[in-house]
Amino acid sequence: MSKAAGSTQTLKNRFRSDYCGLLCPEREHGSVRLAGWVHRKRDHGGLIFIDLRDHTGISQLVIQPEQQELFAKAEQLHVESVICIEGVVVLRAPGAINSRLASGEIEVVVSQITVESNAHPLPFPVADEVVTSEELRLKYRFIDLRREKIHENIIFRSRLTAAIRRYLEEQDFIEIQTPILTSSSPEGARDFLVPSRLHPGKFYALPQAPQQFKQLLMVSGFPRYFQIAPCFRDEDARADRSPGEFYQLDMEMAFIEQNDLFTILEGMIEHLTRTMSHKRITQFPFPRISYKEVMNRFGTDKPDLRIPLEISDVTPLFVGSAFKVFANSTVEGSCVKALVVKGRGNESRLFYDKAEKRAKELGSGGLAYIQFREEGPKGPVVKFLSEADLATLKEHLGLETGDVVFFGAGKWESTCKIMGGMRTYFGDLFTLDKDELSFCWIVDFPMYEYNEEAKKIDFSHNPFSMPQGEMEALETMPPLDILAYQYDIVCNGIELSSGAIRNHKPEIMYKAFGIAGYSREEVDARFGHMIEAFKLGAPPHGGIAPGLDRLVMILCDEQNIREVIAFPMNQQAQDLMMGSPSEVTPVQLKELHLKVELPKK
């Protein structure tokens, strides 16, 4: 734990004069008082050794048998008991030095032990990082948080948050807290509702994000706002998403353009990574990739750029081809995509069967491929292609003997997504550097999309973003061709945040919503307070809100977001330690004028 702690100022009182992880040879012969938890206890040839742990690390204690009363007390100590000791620092013998401990050159000969809390048997060990079920870890989270890795994660999170505050304050940002009890909004995920006692039949909602408040702060004349904001969404858990609540670095700025925001956020991330992490950013400034380009090259708007594979468009090569499956996908709105995997053309049939199974899971009818072997091209589609077709394909894709190329054909978006899924699948063939951070900005998202179910034009991303070209674009361009000032920041295949330059002009907002089928009256009914504010002097503004939990998860090398949250819920949105959610008393329900009707089993 010494790596995470690094404290240099000790609070000296009757419990301690020093911290365990900071004792060094210069303190030889010095008297010390230490306090902490019994990490391990060992009996060696009549001597009792105790590893005493505090938040800075471990010191080894020695209890000698000549001190019979002290020795007897030490014998009765259980692991994880809390003790305070007095003793003298001595140097260890050369053969007994422990290079894994910061205090490994010294030990403390104990003269007095005070037991503050004698621990009962533990549900799982702290000293040995044994595999323990997540349910048990969450039920006894206060025990789990003593374990070294997760303890360091929580301390790192605190320091990262403090560093974020310092950086943004130096950039003239103002930290402002926005309300936790607010109004419900039906547009996003499910709200957590809070019944009002003073206003029977009415409800507050916990904020899914401070979106409207931060925009109103721009209208209020605050130039740069930020907040480490708690957000609440009633949605299911994932490895990178905690159910119920999460924290985001909420930011908004007035009088900015898209690149201004990029410069500030990527500058902050580069600073944090360089000063607080051993990880490396592969490219800085972060590359900007349009939505159209990222889908064409990587098949997803959340690409892991560490995977050394790219999708190629081979649609023109199959215009008029005798292979009708591909030829029929050369019309407007469709495409033929290829994914080359170098050096894998001689794999067994099982390799290709597994790949085809994955393609079908992604929604494909099958998986066409060509192996370029010594004896010539092989594969299920070779018989449909002429020698000239194969030669053109080989030259266009730079194929060599030993390579294999996989194909996808059909509607552009679905084909891109299937091939993107296969790119990720084949990414497992490569050893990706976990210390490499490949950030990128995804820009130029479409403003609208066609909703097949509703048979209408709908917003594709954020309805409150400014369309590129503003009113002129809305009045003169086909809706599906209009782009928005919307952007995502992605790292190693994980989306850290979405953001946008906001639409602060009421007439453009009415027009944008009108294209999506909303009347002026509907817009006023849903967003009247925002429209009213924008009519009273609103500056151009934009923002973003990267997930703090996800950023900590990436920098701490964790695959599960619950490893960087002190008291997370489980996958079923339950707090096993506190027993929530729980039933409430009839008196509480009566005060709120509520009656519980459970679903019939």
Curated annotation (Swiss-Prot):
> Where does the chain bind L-aspartate?
187, 233, 461, 502
Which superkingdom, per the lineage?
Bacteria
EC number(s) from the headed UniProt entry: 6.1.1.23
Question: Single GO cellular component annotation?
Answer: cytoplasm
- What residues correspond to the site Important for tRNA non-discrimination? 44, 95
Q: Where is this region: Aspartate?
A: 211-214
Instruction: Please give the HAMAP family that the UniProt record associates with this protein.
Output: Asp_tRNA_synth_type1
Q: What is this protein called?
A: Aspartate--tRNA(Asp/Asn) ligase
**Source organism:** Pelodictyon phaeoclathratiforme (strain DSM 5477 / BU-1)
Lineage of the organism: Bacteria, Pseudomonadati, Chlorobiota, Chlorobiia, Chlorobiales
